[in-house]
Amino acid sequence: MALDGIRMPDGCYADGTWELSVHVTDLNRDVTLRVTGEVHIGGVMLKLVEKLDVKKDWSDHALWWEKKRTWLLKTHWTLDKYGIQADAKLQFTPQHKLLRLQLPNMKYVKVKVNFSDRVFKAVSDICKTFNIRHPEELSLLKKPRDPTKKKKKKLDDQSEDEALELEGPLITPGSGSIYSSPGLYSKTMTPTYDAHDGSPLSPTSAWFGDSALSEGNPGILAVSQPITSPEILAKMFKPQALLDKAKINQGWLDSSRSLMEQDVKENEALLLRFKYYSFFDLNPKYDAIRINQLYEQAKWAILLEEIECTEEEMMMFAALQYHINKLSIMTSENHLNNSDKEVDEVDAALSDLEITLEGGKTSTILGDITSIPELADYIKVFKPKKLTLKGYKQYWCTFKDTSISCYKSKEESSGTPAHQMNLRGCEVTPDVNISGQKFNIKLLIPVAEGMNEIWLRCDNEKQYAHWMAACRLASKGKTMADSSYNLEVQNILSFLKMQHLNPDPQLIPEQITTDITPECLVSPRYLKKYKNKQITARILEAHQNVAQMSLIEAKMRFIQAWQSLPEFGITHFIARFQGGKKEELIGIAYNRLIRMDASTGDAIKTWRFSNMKQWNVNWEIKMVTVEFADEVRLSFICTEVDCKVVHEFIGGYIFLSTRAKDQNESLDEEMFYKLTSGWV
């Protein structure tokens, strides 16, 4: 008997080899290999394939160590280096697996994704295949459970999802000649879409090659999908309170780890969403799918009451939805007969329209670049205090740089102001009612002990637009000399104009009232408040303000109006602050952190990222600490979510703030990981 066949008490053989168990998932077979600790991973896979003796392309397969939840991707590493011994159970499994992906439009597609890639890379590949630029703005999250419903059987969930399945599966290829979306920006990019209606300028096969996507009609991702049944909306989970909104954010996946490492199973349903509310370089010539999916995410956020809006704003959103639904049907029909379209001058101008919170357009009227514009007018000012019944008091107010000075009269404006406030770092919230002619601006100005609340009341839309634009810029430390000021004023005026009621409702043709389904256009709150006939009439009145818009312009205006809502762009988390006894909310926006009251959502204190020195996480006690200038230190523990999610949001927004239009290279993945992972 040969010595090498004798097995020792520790499981090793006399010749130093031992048995390694590998489960081959494709064949559902367990294979035992004789190895030593010095064998490298590549050698293990070679031995395994030779022993299987099955003619098959194994190039996409890799070894997965279930117990340690890790991929063994470093093929030059030995078993010893990985710490693998005879008790290890490995899997030999494909890296690319199917996912059921719910897009922002709530439709599901079947996608093949690399389960061994970090989620950030996997999302980039998904977006590249779907022709969505700037994938760094999106990520994946697990589906939130509706706490008000009892646990359902999986079959019930699946039947609900199948009602939202897109026609024809979209299978993302693992490789191949797919359309390669440019990196951050390219001046030599060729327009891919009609800037009028967002349709492809060339057949879909030209921009998706021979991939399986072209069979599944990827162009459908650029087309708005109307809600066909009120029952679909009724079944959706609607957060009832701010705490419910915060709990949704528990589901965000870790961008620095792979899907398998986060216990995502093959064929599992995940949500693809715009995670960061900082949309860079939205351009109709290249971004029809991106714009449509962004519009869809905004639409559902409003319908499911994830974000608050006034009654007038809701009717405006409903009118835009109705208009977009009508034009989407017309566009689909037109393109069956005619795929060639000319882009006229209006469309060419529209194609350069960008919607970002920062503005970004250079004004054609530069004026005197050495002088900073000022505002001066009579404004009503109110400082709410406890146990006071005093209302608004009129002052002559001047707005210079980032400060407002209040004088008792215009004649006294050369002297010392009665009040003065610097708006740098403040919170600016609109309080507007068009029909009631109410144009208020709520300011929360940071002071040492918290926030001072000040209200400004304007007399009309024009005055409000100029002062609101100046307040928004001042809160970011910018003055009215900034190139985005005039654009901000125009955006506010157009937003208000869309909410105007039509003075002559008789102009609305009666026959078009039949194709409106109010239950699919407004949130449940207003369905309870008004009869369907009343809502239909108001939607049609509001529609006359947007009826002349092209399809892409209507979607862009919808996104812009969504961005104008007070709650836009704030991601909530439940937190307990150091020294605090009760649970509060921490809100993270693209440029600041906000400590919030959990019941009302009111801002208690705001800290700007521009004033931040550093942030870190104590992984043992799960505490996030952020240090700001002036020795300010903020520490909190997240109670319902892994602190890694909050850490990634802060680092992610810092990463997005480094983007610039003159960059012409692909994303700096390593920089993203350094800012967000916490351990790279």
Curated annotation (Swiss-Prot):
Principal subcellular localization: cytoplasm
Effect noted on mutating residue 393 to A: Reduces phosphatidylinositol phosphate binding
GO biological process: adherens junction maintenance; cell adhesion; cell-matrix adhesion; focal adhesion assembly; integrin activation; integrin-mediated signaling pathway; limb development; negative regulation of fat cell differentiation
Induction: By serum in lung fetal fibroblast cultured cells.
Subcellular locations according to the entry: Cytoplasm; Cytoplasm, Cell cortex; Cytoplasm, Cytoskeleton; Cytoplasm, Cytoskeleton, Stress fiber
Membrane topology note: Peripheral membrane protein
All copies of domain FERM, residue ranges: 189-661
Residues at which a 1,2-diacyl-sn-glycero-3-phospho-(1D-myo-inositol-3,4,5-trisphosphate) binds: 383
Keyword terms: Cell adhesion, Cell junction, Cell membrane, Cell projection, Cell shape, Cytoplasm, Cytoskeleton, Lipid-binding, Membrane, Nucleus, Phosphoprotein, Wnt signaling pathway
Interaction with membranes containing phosphatidylinositol phosphate as annotated region, ranges: 40-81
Stated role: Scaffolding protein that enhances integrin activation mediated by TLN1 and/or TLN2, but activates integrins only weakly by itself. Binds to membranes enriched in phosphoinositides. Enhances integrin-mediated cell adhesion onto the extracellular matrix and cell spreading; this requires both its ability to interact with integrins and with phospholipid membranes. Required for the assembly of focal adhesions. Participates in the connection between extracellular matrix adhesion sites and the actin cytoskeleton and also in the orchestration of actin assembly and cell shape modulation.
Quaternary context: Interacts with ILK. Interacts with FBLIM1. Interacts with ITGB1 and ITGB3. Interacts with active, unphosphorylated CTNNB1. Identified in a complex with CTNNB1 and TCF7L2/TCF4. Interacts with ITGB1; the interaction is inhibited in presence of ITGB1BP1.
Protein family per UniProt: Belongs to the kindlin family.
Domain remark from Swiss-Prot or TrEMBL: The FERM domain is not correctly detected by PROSITE or Pfam techniques because it contains the insertion of a PH domain.
Stated name of the protein: Fermitin family homolog 2
Originating gene: FERMT2
